[in-house]
Amino acid sequence: MRIPSTSWRRIAAAASLATVTFLTSACGTGTGSNGDAAGSAAKSGDKPFIALSNGFIGNGWRQTMVAAFEDAAKQAQADGLIGKYKAINAPGDNSATEQIAQIKSLLLQKPDALLIDPSSPTALKPVIQQACNAGIKVVVFDSAIDAPCAHVIQNSFTDWATHAAKPLLEGIGGKGNVIVSRGVVGSQPEAEMHKTTQKILSDYPSVKTAATVTGMCDGATAQKAVLGVLSSVPKVDGVIGCGDGYGVAQAFTSAGKDVPAVTFETNGRALNYWKDKKIDNGSVAVMSDPGQSVAAMWAALDLLDGKKVPEHMTLPIVLVEQKDRDAWASVLKPDQYAAWPWTRDLFRQQVEAAENGGKPVQPPVPTAAD
């Protein structure tokens, strides 16, 4: 299923504008970006207040995720579905302590629903329970969580790690040297992905892991990390990452080496680089969906409306294969990550599929620009 490219351009443009707003809160001002401008409280009546707590803002995926939420929340506010909204980004490097303090501050503002992209699968349990005890609907996304009172929306990180590794390993003929670039170490998704990657590598005895670095699922970070080990690894056939391939490619180029098979990020810059360089060596682009924040908002609104929502939902990852690469590349800004365009109707289709034991509904891929 496809939708017109003009819709994707509007999504990308709105997200780019929102980035300017929420990066201020990421610096630790504590104010966040919000929809409660002067006078809106008087107009909101009993419409719900939706708050988002984000535990880490240090990569483009997280920035796209917050921007997607803000764009959708702004439209929901204009449509009279919510009274106000707020997105707050915890400062620091994925610190559970800082996010807990952030959430406690949000609870004092009495939101009706709290969306959380957590920094830890366990440390936030007490503060989440505190929110539930206060009657707040809690939807955690982008990670599993040890908090029975919360609803959870996430992608399959096993699928992500599998699609990031297997095509690449097959592309290099199942043998050679690889570098593994890990993501946000300490988070539940990264732990699950690394475990999957190691399991897959064990099925390829002729592949040697020459080095392991921490790229944080961020191109710039991965570029520095990979460049730091290239001098000690004479030959590299592939780099298994979590959406940091553009930076990895730059590391090889700056070192005067051929670009091996990599796991590209799903943003416009990486996809156009992949396209323009005519790379066909097992590379793939795959990441979790930053649009999960929007799906979480629809889940929260359904819960507030008394509708049934599964306690745990697994939504499709964003896999960009070569056949869809050009369509995505044509509608994304350089720093904009591919995100599924969740509408309330599409979310309800996912709920129905989950309740009936069916496969997740595949969201639409954009049509290529004219």
Cite the ranges covered by each PLM segment.
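A residue-level marker of the well-folded mature domains of exported/periplasmic proteins
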Residues: R2-R10, C27-D370
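Sec-dependent N-terminal signal peptides
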Residues: W8-T19
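C-terminal motif of bacterial Sec signal peptides marking the signal peptidase cleavage site
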Residues: F22-A26
